[in-house]
UniProtKB/Swiss-Prot annotation:
Present in the aqueous fluid surrounding olfactory sensory dendrites and are thought to aid in the capture and transport of hydrophobic odorants into and through this fluid. GO terms for molecular function: odorant binding. The keyword Transport applies. Antenna. Keywords: Disulfide bond, Olfaction, Sensory transduction, Signal, Transport. Disulfide bonds join C38-C73, C69-C127, C116-C136. It comes from the Eukaryota. The keyword tRNA processing does not apply. This is General odorant-binding protein 1. One of its GO terms (biological process) is sensory perception of smell.
């Protein structure tokens, strides 16, 4: 009996972490829906567009300005930016809360993004600034254990493709 109790306690402790990862997965997939609409505006080649599917991989790097331009366009699509291309806190929080269990991560994600935004506020080129910000955000999520694994993301991509 003590072994069963210990297992239940471990599951109870792990459940919030899994919920956080699943929320992040859902937000990532939802945000990614704007990518097709932003491809031309941000001058993404097919090859660079494919890179977005690897965003959560450990070795993914933001080396191309166009990726930042695409993220800027996608953020505008969902009305997540102010006129000065900075995060609109309220709209971003509401966007995250619109996903199942989004309230679990909304405030934390806004704080992470804002913290990264402050680090790169000196960058005048919006696309490069947003690219650096996205890299910082990704690293922060990985450090906090809320980043979805590539296996989880690939499973979702496959399930979505099969559903179409």
């Amino acid at each position: 009996m003590p072994g069963v109790l210990r297992a239940l306690l471990l599951l109870a402790a792990a459940a919030p972490l899994l919920a956080d990862v699943n929320v992040m997965k859902d937000v990532t997939l939802g945000f990614g829906q704007a990518l097709d609409k932003c491809r031309e505006e941000s001058q993404l080649t097919e090859e660079k567009m494919e890179e977005f599917f690897h965003f959560w991989r450990d070795d993914f790097k933001f080396e191309h300005r166009e990726l930042g331009c695409a993220i800027q366009c996608m953020s505008r699509h969902f009305n997540l930016l102010t006129d000065s291309s900075r995060m609109h806190h309220d709209n971003t929080e509401k966007f995250i809360q619109s996903f199942p269990n989004g309230e679990v991560l909304a405030r934390q994600m806004v704080e992470l993004i804002h913290s990264c935004e402050k680090q790169f506020d000196h960058e005048e080129d919006h696309c490069w600034r947003i690219s650096h910000l996205a890299d910082c955000f990704k690293s922060s999520c990985v450090q906090r254990g809320i980043a979805p694994s590539m296996e989880l993301m690939m499973t979702e991509f496959i399930m979505e493709a099969e559903a179409r």
